[in-house]
Every structure is written in C-alpha cells, then in structure tokens.
C-alpha cells in the first residue's frame, strides 16, 4: 500500500522502518522543500511516474546481509537522479555496488564527532558551507568494512572509518549517521545541500501557497455540494473548519460530537471558540451514551480505537441524513497519521490504526475530504496562523480523537472518566500557573489499571493510581519527558490525592519517545 499525495514531488523518501524517517521530511520542509515518504517496496514504475528530482534511502532496523533484508530494485540507481543513503540506506548502497557490510564489534549509539576528509569537486557538495568536527547522531549495529569500486570516503568518526561516502562520478552520497535528528548539529544543512545544491529542488513549499492551492481544490471538488466537517475542538479539526469555511462558506456543516470522552469543560469551550473566534455556526451532537455503551466491557486499546472510529462514522451518517445535499465528510487527518497506518512491511503489517485513516465504510454515501493529510502538526499551526486564527487556539496541546478512552487503561466507564477529568484539571491548572504549559508539547494524566495500598488519616485505602505525562517536542515525532521542578510535581500530587476521592497515588512518566510513545494507548 502506498500513500500518494501529489502526482509529482521534489524528493521521495524510501522508508526502511527507521524511527526517524518522518524527521527527514520535516527537516526538508523547514527549508520549503516538498517531499513525501513511501515504503521501500514502492514499485519502480510508480517512483518514475512521480518524477522526483532525488531519492533518499532512510535508516532501518534490518541488516543488508540477512535473508529477510529490506531490499529495493537496483534500477533505482539507474534513474539518472541523485540518491542519498542514511544509515541503513548507506549500507544498502554499499551492498548493491559490491562493497562489504558486516556486523560491528561494538554498536554505536549516541553522539559522535564527524571529521571531513579532503574534499574535491562533487564529493564536497554534501558538506558545502558546513564545519568539520561537528556532533552527529549515530544509531547502528552494522558497519561498512570495504567501499565499493568508484566510491570514496568523505568523512569519518572515531568509531566509524566510513561516516560518509560519495561516488566519484555519479551523484550518489551516503552517511552512516542521522542528519535528520536534532542532535546532529549541522545535519539539516546536509539535507538542504542534497536537496537544493545536488538535486536542484525548488524551495517554494509554504503555508500561503498551500492554503491557496487547497481552497481552489476544495471549491473545484465541492462545487454546489455540501461538506459535513467532523469537529473535535482540537487544533487539527478547527483548522480544517476554518479552511473549509474560507473556501465554501455556508456549504460547510461543522458537527461537534460529544462522545463522552472529552476533558472537563471541553464541550463548552469548543462551542464558545467556534462562535466567538471562528464565527462558524456549529452543530453539537450529544452521543456520549452511544459511545460508552459500545465501549462497555472493552479493554484492548486497538479495539477501543476501532470502535470509536466506526461509531463516529455512524453518528455523522445519522446527522448527514438531516441535511440535504451533503456529499462529503471532512476530517483533520495529518501526514503522521497516514504514515503510521502503513507499515514498511506492507498493508498486512499495520503499525498503528488511526481513527481518521483507512477510508469510509462501503455503506456510506459521501466521500472523504482531508485537506491536512500532507501536513505535520507544526505546519497545521502555521496554516491556522495564515488563516488568521488566534494563537491561543492554535497552541492548545494535542488531544487524541478517541479522547480519554485511550488514557484509561482497560475498560472505560463513567466513574473512571470523572476521576480522570478531575485529576487532569488539577494537573493542568498547576502547569499553567507555573508557566510550563506553553513550554511543553503535551500534558495529560493517565488512569492506570493499578490499585495500591495507602494510608489517609488513620484509615487504610486501596485506590487508583494516576500517572502524569508531560513531554517536550518540536513536532511530536520524537519527544522527551519534561524536567519539571520537583516542587511543581509535589503540588500536583498533593492536590490530586487530597481533592480527588478514589486516587491515593500519583506517578510521573519519565519515558521519552522513542522507545515509548507519547500516549499510553
């Protein structure tokens, strides 16, 4: 399964399963270079049809010398366009051209200093304007032992004699490290040099052009029809509604479904926001009993997500029948949602299902409109600013479509939802008062499926445990736990335990992404 957003693209990134692949696209887009990610097994004819100006081979967990290695059609190197290999991509390039790749005696993970070798001619283009001795991020267990014929070394590190290589005649380059990771000090410049200096890509990707293009596409597609827009009150769906309203005006029918899994005061805040800030008429549907009824007895997180996604569609279908002329359903699907729903191993190996991804059931009569499906989160915020939306709306922390259902471990019920809402209000109140809310990417509480013994007064308790999760991130692709002051964490814990009956223990999640994900389910 391949996700194609545009007929043509400046750069194609072939994904071999690296946890950092999406970061490659993000770094390039920061320079205004449009690119897309496709699975490594994309058909050669499909690649040629896109007419890319260059190809990037991502990193990945496999080894090129193993039987089940992720391989590509060698004809990719015969398309007459530049190719950049990153980590596994470098080993694959070495392997294909007759070099030797072997298991390293010592794995190399973390920071390393890269020294440029004597550079001449085209071999220097990758590092043009950059400085030798800068820190990069290594993450590999294999190494290149012998270069293929025609290749030369252009950089090395203490543990990697071949930290970067280049073909002496053809525009083929490869690096053993990850330039896309923020720890690589000038890594983004290497990617920029490849895209602009070597491939000759254009850097005209920006939100003004994107907005104008999408408005035109929406108008041409919708014409005299009507669009039902799924609204959650989060940044994504709010930007979708604002974009659609700009494009088609009264032909937009925005529907906010209260599925009973919202945070405290969420419904009222959403209704106020649409009325006062967006000036878009909003229809609210209370479907909490329907959702909670279908979730009864369900504890598996994947099943919960699917039930919620299917029920959303059913509710919207009922609402659509109340209005004549509705042909389309609009959703706030983002590019990471699309990518994460397609594994590099093919459609049978889905990494993670997403409630917005996968199309509509056969019984539905309207078509999907997903104007944000090629954007990352920070690009959505930039688009919102381009549309004139207020900052306080755009900078709200992300909130998942399935809501609190995936922040309650196990079965979801009304009592646990109330417990979690109360704890969440306290945590967010303390975070905002301390000034850390705007400094963090996402903050929430999780009700664990764990009870523990406690003592309150002279009485023994056996109550619930709540986990506080606060992370820092640039785009949500990677994240680190926020190093909050102990005094702040103590205030959160004390207030939650004292003010919320049924909770006697609070813990703080100090996991980063990867290896953990931001949400628990």
From Swiss-Prot:
Its EC number(s): 6.3.5.2
GO cellular component, one term: cytosol
Keyword set, alphabetical order: ATP-binding, Glutamine amidotransferase, GMP biosynthesis, Ligase, Nucleotide-binding, Purine biosynthesis
Residues annotated to bind ATP: 232-238
Top-rank EC class of the record's enzyme: ligase
Residue span, GMPS ATP-PPase domain: 205-396
InterPro entries: Class_I_gatase-like, GATASE, GMP_synth_C, GMP_synth_GATase, GMP_synthase, GMPS_ATP_PPase_dom, Rossmann-like_a/b/a_fold
Active-site positions on this chain: 87 (nucleophile), 178, 180
Pathway entry: Purine metabolism; GMP biosynthesis; GMP from XMP (L-Gln route): step 1/1
Name of a matching Pfam family: GMP_synt_C
Listed GO MF terms: ATP binding; GMP synthase activity
Reaction(s) the record says it catalyses: XMP + L-glutamine + ATP + H2O = GMP + L-glutamate + AMP + diphosphate + 2 H(+)
Glutamine amidotransferase type-1 domain sequence ranges: 10-204
Role summary: Catalyzes the synthesis of GMP from XMP.
NCBIfam families attached to this UniProt entry: guaA_Cterm, guaA_Nterm, PRK00074.1
Summary of subunit composition and partner proteins: Homodimer.
UniProt protein name: GMP synthase [glutamine-hydrolyzing]
